[in-house]
Design a protein with these regions (language model features):
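Mixed-charge, low-complexity segments
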Residues: 43-44
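Active-site-adjacent pocket-lining segments in enzyme domains
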Residues: 2-8, 12, 19, 26-39, ...
Length: 165
Protein backbone atom coordinates (compact mmCIF):
# COMPACT_ATOMS: atom_id res chain seq x y z
CA UNK A 1 0.00 0.00 0.00
CA UNK A 2 1.17 3.49 -0.83
CA UNK A 3 1.00 5.85 2.14
CA UNK A 4 -0.42 9.35 2.02
CA UNK A 5 0.71 11.54 4.91
CA UNK A 6 -1.61 14.26 6.21
CA UNK A 7 0.10 16.80 8.47
CA UNK A 8 -1.99 17.52 11.56
CA UNK A 9 -1.47 20.02 14.36
CA UNK A 10 -3.57 21.70 17.00
CA UNK A 11 -6.19 23.70 15.14
CA UNK A 12 -5.88 21.94 11.77
CA UNK A 13 -8.82 22.42 9.42
CA UNK A 14 -10.24 18.90 9.58
CA UNK A 15 -12.71 19.34 6.70
CA UNK A 16 -10.10 20.39 4.12
CA UNK A 17 -8.54 16.95 3.50
CA UNK A 18 -11.82 15.07 4.02
CA UNK A 19 -12.75 14.45 0.37
CA UNK A 20 -9.29 13.51 -0.84
CA UNK A 21 -8.64 11.25 2.15
CA UNK A 22 -11.99 9.48 1.80
CA UNK A 23 -11.26 8.74 -1.86
CA UNK A 24 -7.64 7.70 -1.41
CA UNK A 25 -8.38 5.54 1.64
CA UNK A 26 -11.17 3.64 -0.14
CA UNK A 27 -10.71 -0.11 -0.71
CA UNK A 28 -8.89 -1.11 -3.89
CA UNK A 29 -7.14 2.24 -4.42
CA UNK A 30 -3.74 0.99 -3.33
CA UNK A 31 -3.45 3.90 -0.90
CA UNK A 32 -3.74 4.23 2.84
CA UNK A 33 -4.00 7.55 4.66
CA UNK A 34 -1.81 8.17 7.70
CA UNK A 35 -1.26 11.27 9.81
CA UNK A 36 1.98 12.99 10.74
CA UNK A 37 2.52 15.53 13.51
CA UNK A 38 5.44 17.17 15.25
CA UNK A 39 5.09 14.42 17.86
CA UNK A 40 2.65 11.60 18.55
CA UNK A 41 0.55 13.49 21.09
CA UNK A 42 -3.13 13.96 20.28
CA UNK A 43 -3.94 17.02 18.17
CA UNK A 44 -7.28 18.82 18.40
CA UNK A 45 -8.74 19.99 15.09
CA UNK A 46 -10.79 23.12 14.54
CA UNK A 47 -13.87 20.90 14.66
CA UNK A 48 -12.87 19.41 18.01
CA UNK A 49 -11.65 16.02 16.79
CA UNK A 50 -8.83 14.54 18.87
CA UNK A 51 -6.45 12.76 16.51
CA UNK A 52 -3.30 10.87 17.47
CA UNK A 53 -0.71 11.09 14.68
CA UNK A 54 0.52 7.84 13.19
CA UNK A 55 3.98 9.32 12.73
CA UNK A 56 6.07 12.18 14.03
CA UNK A 57 8.38 14.33 11.94
CA UNK A 58 11.21 12.21 13.35
CA UNK A 59 9.88 8.76 12.38
CA UNK A 60 7.88 8.93 9.16
CA UNK A 61 8.40 6.43 6.32
CA UNK A 62 10.69 7.59 3.53
CA UNK A 63 8.60 5.97 0.81
CA UNK A 64 5.33 7.88 1.23
CA UNK A 65 3.47 8.85 -1.95
CA UNK A 66 1.84 12.19 -1.13
CA UNK A 67 2.09 14.84 1.60
CA UNK A 68 -1.01 16.90 2.40
CA UNK A 69 -0.72 20.16 4.33
CA UNK A 70 -4.10 21.25 5.69
CA UNK A 71 -5.03 24.78 6.64
CA UNK A 72 -5.43 26.29 10.08
CA UNK A 73 -4.43 29.45 11.90
CA UNK A 74 -1.18 27.91 13.16
CA UNK A 75 0.31 28.68 9.73
CA UNK A 76 -0.46 32.38 10.19
CA UNK A 77 1.13 32.25 13.63
CA UNK A 78 4.28 30.60 12.17
CA UNK A 79 3.79 27.57 14.45
CA UNK A 80 4.20 24.94 11.73
CA UNK A 81 7.64 25.80 10.40
CA UNK A 82 9.00 22.55 11.86
CA UNK A 83 7.39 20.62 9.00
CA UNK A 84 9.84 22.23 6.56
CA UNK A 85 12.32 19.28 6.53
CA UNK A 86 9.49 16.88 5.59
CA UNK A 87 8.33 19.20 2.80
CA UNK A 88 11.92 19.60 1.58
CA UNK A 89 12.32 15.83 1.56
CA UNK A 90 9.12 15.37 -0.45
CA UNK A 91 9.98 18.06 -3.00
CA UNK A 92 13.55 16.80 -3.43
CA UNK A 93 12.30 13.22 -3.94
CA UNK A 94 9.59 14.40 -6.39
CA UNK A 95 6.82 13.28 -4.03
CA UNK A 96 3.69 15.37 -4.60
CA UNK A 97 2.79 17.93 -1.95
CA UNK A 98 -0.73 19.30 -1.61
CA UNK A 99 -1.31 22.52 0.34
CA UNK A 100 -4.67 24.12 0.98
CA UNK A 101 -5.74 27.41 2.53
CA UNK A 102 -3.16 28.89 4.91
CA UNK A 103 -0.70 26.06 4.23
CA UNK A 104 -0.25 27.59 0.76
CA UNK A 105 1.19 30.70 2.40
CA UNK A 106 3.82 28.51 4.08
CA UNK A 107 4.73 27.06 0.69
CA UNK A 108 4.96 30.59 -0.73
CA UNK A 109 7.10 31.90 2.12
CA UNK A 110 9.57 29.06 1.68
CA UNK A 111 10.05 29.57 -2.05
CA UNK A 112 8.23 26.50 -3.35
CA UNK A 113 5.78 28.57 -5.41
CA UNK A 114 8.12 31.20 -6.86
CA UNK A 115 8.51 29.50 -10.25
CA UNK A 116 5.38 27.38 -10.63
CA UNK A 117 1.71 28.07 -11.29
CA UNK A 118 -0.32 28.08 -8.07
CA UNK A 119 -3.42 29.27 -6.31
CA UNK A 120 -4.21 30.29 -2.75
CA UNK A 121 -6.71 32.29 -0.75
CA UNK A 122 -5.88 35.59 -2.52
CA UNK A 123 -2.68 37.07 -3.88
CA UNK A 124 -2.91 40.03 -1.52
CA UNK A 125 -3.35 37.81 1.54
CA UNK A 126 -0.50 35.56 0.43
CA UNK A 127 1.84 38.53 0.14
CA UNK A 128 0.99 39.67 3.68
CA UNK A 129 1.56 36.18 5.08
CA UNK A 130 4.65 35.35 3.00
CA UNK A 131 6.95 38.39 2.83
CA UNK A 132 9.66 36.43 0.96
CA UNK A 133 7.22 35.24 -1.72
CA UNK A 134 8.33 36.02 -5.31
CA UNK A 135 5.71 34.15 -7.33
CA UNK A 136 3.23 36.96 -8.07
CA UNK A 137 3.39 36.30 -11.82
CA UNK A 138 2.53 32.62 -11.32
CA UNK A 139 -0.49 33.15 -9.07
CA UNK A 140 -3.78 32.06 -10.66
CA UNK A 141 -7.21 33.13 -9.43
CA UNK A 142 -8.40 29.52 -9.45
CA UNK A 143 -9.87 27.18 -6.90
CA UNK A 144 -6.98 24.71 -7.23
CA UNK A 145 -3.84 24.41 -9.35
CA UNK A 146 -1.37 21.58 -9.90
CA UNK A 147 2.13 22.21 -11.25
CA UNK A 148 5.45 20.41 -10.81
CA UNK A 149 4.15 17.96 -8.18
CA UNK A 150 2.72 20.76 -6.03
CA UNK A 151 -1.03 21.15 -5.63
CA UNK A 152 -2.39 24.37 -4.17
CA UNK A 153 -5.93 25.41 -3.35
CA UNK A 154 -7.80 28.15 -1.58
CA UNK A 155 -9.70 27.36 1.58
CA UNK A 156 -13.07 27.01 -0.13
CA UNK A 157 -11.81 24.49 -2.69
CA UNK A 158 -11.86 21.17 -0.86
CA UNK A 159 -13.53 19.35 -3.77
CA UNK A 160 -11.28 20.90 -6.42
CA UNK A 161 -8.25 20.12 -4.23
CA UNK A 162 -9.30 16.46 -4.10
CA UNK A 163 -9.61 16.28 -7.90
CA UNK A 164 -6.13 17.65 -8.74
CA UNK A 165 -3.33 15.31 -9.70
Amino acid sequence: MKEVLVFIFDGFADWEPAYICAELNAPDTGYTVKTIGFDKKAKVSMGGFHVIPDYSINDYPSDFSLLILTGGTAWIEQKNNGILPVVDYAVNKHIPVGAICNAVNFMAENGYLDTIKHSGNTLEFMKTQAPHYKGDNNFLEAQAVSDSNIITANGSATLEFAKKK
